[in-house]
Amino acid sequence: MYNYLDFEKPVADLDVQILELKKIAQEKGSLDMSDEIARLEMRSQTALRDLYKKLSPWQKTQVARHPDRPHFMDYSAQLLRDVTPLAGDRKFAEDEAIQAGFARFKGEAIAYIGQEKGHDTQTRLRYNFGSARPEGYRKAVRIMELADRFGLPLLTFVDTAGAYPGVSAEERGQAEAIAQSTAATLRLRVPVVSVIIGEGGSGGAIAIAAANKVYMLEHSIYSVISPEGAASILWRDPARAKDAATNMQITAQDLYRLKIIDGIIPEPLGGAHRQKEAAIEAAGDGIAAALKSMIGKDGETIKQERWDKYLQIGRSLA
């Protein structure tokens, strides 16, 4: 059984009926219930399709945060080969919320940076729920500089509610670390492709997403602040997160229309968590196409195109 979201209750009810019928058919081998099961399965798929055709921004936020949604380590396992992770920022400590290193993607050498949230209590604590500390962003800068030195394309996978806001992180220069990471991305003379695979929250996401090509999965979100944070500021009530999400234009569809991102990667029906391998494969195809579009361009051209991209975004939204 899936972990159903609250708005998926009609689908959940049908799926429960399907499981009950399958159990009865198994217990009473002489009873043929295949036609009834097939009918209910068709109704379930239709209900799911109808739901996902008209998701609200808040519902998309829930899908982006689904506990079973594939995270960076899932993408790494399926898309990357010969992975050589690097650890530490050479200044303070290692931060596992940001995974980084070198690997091969479809046979080509690349550098990678990915934000990992974890899948269970143990791994979520290990990765700090995907909220990186300053040393994580300084490690990211270290990888960026190595990628630039060796002429390796950089792939980044964004999935964070935001950078860690704790006192210790602020004492070690969280804002400066985020700013330096963003600036370092813009300086690179190698192709940079970023995919927002779940949440793209605030500066914690932007720090590794100032790429030549930025893609979002169909049901991911990308914003300067979480809906709960915006609701707390605007209405002093985090319970109004649904209202905030509706007005913030945080969905992939909104951001593609505003020309903030370069494309939307389709997800399987019902979200990436229902067919993880298919969702990851689609993301890999999008990354490959983005890299192919930059083949033959020299470093200065790649860098200038990145600068021009973000200057144009600033002008168009001013």
Curated annotation (Swiss-Prot):
Domain CoA carboxyltransferase C-terminal: 43-293
Reactions catalysed: N(6)-carboxybiotinyl-L-lysyl-[protein] + acetyl-CoA = N(6)-biotinyl-L-lysyl-[protein] + malonyl-CoA
Pathway: Lipid metabolism; malonyl-CoA biosynthesis; malonyl-CoA from acetyl-CoA: step 1/1
Primary localization: cytoplasm
Gene3D superfamilies: 2-enoyl-CoA Hydratase, Chain A, domain 1 (3.90.226.10)
InterPro entries: Acetyl_CoA_COase_a_su (IPR001095), ClpP/crotonase-like_dom_sf (IPR029045), COA_CT_C (IPR011763)
GO CC terms, sorted: acetyl-CoA carboxylase complex
UniProt keyword annotation of Lipid biosynthesis present: yes
Keyword terms of this UniProt record: ATP-binding, Cytoplasm, Fatty acid biosynthesis, Fatty acid metabolism, Lipid biosynthesis, Lipid metabolism, Nucleotide-binding, Transferase
Protein origin, superkingdom: Bacteria
Its EC number(s): 2.1.3.15
Enzyme class label: transferase
Location within or outside the cell: Cytoplasm
GO aspect biological process, one term: malonyl-CoA biosynthetic process
A molecular-function term among this protein's GO annotations: carboxyl- or carbamoyltransferase activity
PANTHER family: ACETYL-COENZYME A CARBOXYLASE CARBOXYL TRANSFERASE SUBUNIT ALPHA (PTHR42853), ACETYL-COENZYME A CARBOXYLASE CARBOXYL TRANSFERASE SUBUNIT ALPHA, CHLOROPLASTIC (PTHR42853:SF3)
NCBIfam families, sorted: accA (TIGR00513), AccA_sub (NF041504), PRK05724.1 (NF004344)
The family this protein is said to belong to: Belongs to the AccA family.
Annotated function: Component of the acetyl coenzyme A carboxylase (ACC) complex. First, biotin carboxylase catalyzes the carboxylation of biotin on its carrier protein (BCCP) and then the CO(2) group is transferred by the carboxyltransferase to acetyl-CoA to form malonyl-CoA.
The protein's assembly and partners: Acetyl-CoA carboxylase is a heterohexamer composed of biotin carboxyl carrier protein (AccB), biotin carboxylase (AccC) and two subunits each of ACCase subunit alpha (AccA) and ACCase subunit beta (AccD).
HAMAP family the record matches: AcetylCoA_CT_alpha
Protein name, as recorded: Acetyl-coenzyme A carboxylase carboxyl transferase subunit alpha
Species for this entry: Bartonella bacilliformis (strain ATCC 35685 / KC583 / Herrer 020/F12,63)
Classification lineage: Bacteria, Pseudomonadati, Pseudomonadota, Alphaproteobacteria, Hyphomicrobiales
